[in-house]
Every structure is written in structure tokens, then in C-alpha cells.
């Protein structure tokens, strides 16, 4: 059996701010890095904080 040490699964927490200054959180569980790239690219509001946690 071959062991794969590359884990491509992350929980993402983002603090966003809209054009009116309202801040809100979004949570996304179990995203691959490719999914995160799409999410990041499609986020219209400003990202204030970003946290990626590797799923073990």
C-alpha cells in the first residue's frame, strides 16, 4: 500500500466586509485547494481575515 501524505482538504473561515461596511463570516468545510481558488476568485466582498485549517 502506498501512503499519500498530501491532504487536499481544508476548512476555510473568512471574515468578509461588504460595500456598506457590514462584516460577516462564511464557513466552508472540506474544501480542496482547487475549490478554495474558485471560492476566493468568486468572492465579491473584501476579505478582512482568512483562516485555512488542514483537515486531518
UniProtKB/Swiss-Prot annotation:
Cell membrane listed as a keyword: no
Pfam families (alphabetical): UDG-inhib_P56
GO-annotated biological processes: biological process involved in interaction with host
Keywords from the UniProt entry: Early protein, Host-virus interaction
Keyword Hydrolase included in the entry's annotation: no
InterPro entries reported for this sequence: P56, UDG_Inhib_phi29likevirus
Family per similarity comment: Belongs to the phi29likevirus protein p56 family.
Function statement: Inhibits the host uracil-DNA glycosylase (UDG), an enzyme which removes uracil residues from DNA by the base excision repair. Interacts with host uracil-DNA glycosylase and prevents the latter from binding to DNA. Since the viral DNA polymerase efficiently incorporates dUMP into DNA, the virus needs to prevent the deleterious effect caused by host UDG when it eliminates uracil residues present in the viral genome.
Assembly notes: Homodimer. Interacts with host UDG; this interaction inhibits the uracil-DNA glycosylase.
The name this protein goes by in its record: Protein p56
Species of the source: Bacillus phage phi29
Gene encoding the protein: 0.8
Amino acid at each position: 500500500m502506498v501512503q499519500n501524505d498530501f491532504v487536499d482538504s481544508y476548512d476555510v473561515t473568512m471574515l468578509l466586509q461588504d460595500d456598506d461596511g457590514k462584516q460577516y463570516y462564511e464557513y466552508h468545510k472540506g474544501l480542496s485547494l482547487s475549490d478554495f481558488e474558485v471560492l476566493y476568485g468568486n468572492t465579491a466582498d473584501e476579505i478582512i481575515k482568512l483562516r485555512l485549517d488542514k483537515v486531518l
